[in-house]
Each structure stands twice: as C-alpha cells, then as structure tokens.
C-alpha cells in the first residue's frame, strides 16, 4: 500500500514537471537573437546620420564595396586599411564583400591634408570624415578623407581609418555608450572592434533589416 502511494506520488510529480519543462523550452526558443542592449545600441547608431540628413531611417549598401586609395597613405595606413577590410569581410562577407580596386570604385578613400578635405565636403573640425550618397536609402557611393597632417599620431590615423570605413557601411552615428567602441563619440585611439561593434555590423546586414526602415520597424523585427 505504501509502495503504491509512493508510485502514485512519483507519477504526479512527473506530470507536473514535464509540462513545466516544455513551457520553459518554448519560452527560451521564442527569445530574440539579440539582447535589448544590442537593439537599443543599434537604433542609436544606425538610424540617420551624424551630419546631413536628419531622417531617422536605415541606410546600407546592397552591392559589393570597391575601394580606391587616393593621396599619400603611408605603409601603416595601408596595413590598417587592409586589416579593417578583412575584419568587415569576416563579419558580413557572405552578404557583401569589400575589396581594393584601381578603377570602377564606389568608395574613394583619400589620404590628404586637412586643406584638401573639401573633397569630402567635410564639416570643420574633423581629421577623419565620410560622406555617402544614397537612392531610396541604398548607399551607392562614399568619399572618405583621412588627414595626413603631421599633427596626428599614427595611432590616431589608424583609428580614423577604421571608424570612417565602418561608418560608411551605414552605421553613421556616434554614441557615448561604450568608451572602447569604434562608434564612441569622443576622441579615442580604438584600434579594433568590440564584440558589440561586430554585432552592429552583423545586424545591419542581416536579412531582417531593410533600407528605409524606421525605429519601430527595426525594433519589431529584431525582437522576433
């Protein structure tokens, strides 16, 4: 009699336990691929741009990026540029590919003194600058200027190469959220991507994100 009661108790407990497990698994599986912090940071840096248009929508490329080098880069500049291209291709190379070309470019990166920054229609006070053009929020052309003036340390130039090329992907805003992020608003010497920087690039070129999306649409698709 006692053994029967024990058996019934065990069956009852198992019946309670397994539905709970099933519910837990469904809840876990229904979670978004991205955290709230990642989504919040993405909407901060990917909607609109620091300069120019104030329209808060997604802009990005839908074709491979071909980069032509102009001006007078030094050896370290070229090493940095190649490393940044490699880093970006590692993140989104299955979506779009970045490469260096001698002609038929859609990005010009200009290593020039500040006195020649008019090439990029640069806002005053910048030692690195990007200026992109788009149609229907699809980017098709960019000019990047990197200052070669002696006042700059190589570490600063290398930082700006990474920052300006990354932002020309469509992540056009700065932020004060993460000091070591390539998108940090104040002057830094960041030489590599944080994991959250990589995530921002990944999200922008994910299948969920489309040119012209507004904040509500972005948040909705990323939370699914």
Briefly describe each language-model feature range.
Residues 1-10:
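Bacterial N-terminal signal peptides that target proteins for export
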Residues 18-20:
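C-terminal motif of bacterial Sec signal peptides marking the signal peptidase cleavage site
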Residues 22-69, 73-75:
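Disordered inhibitory propeptide/activation segment of secreted metzincin zinc metalloprotease zymogens
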Residues 56-60, 76-77, 114-140:
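Catalytic zinc-binding patch centered on the HExxH motif and its immediate surroundings
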Residues 65, 69, 97-118, 185-186:
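Acidic helix-start/capping segments at beta-turn-to-alpha-helix junctions
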Residues 75-99:
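Zn2+-dependent metallopeptidase catalytic core
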Residues 126-156, 172-224:
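Metalloprotease/metallohydrolase-associated module, dominated by Zn2+-dependent proteases
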Residues 159-171:
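Active-site recognition of the HExxH zinc-binding catalytic motif
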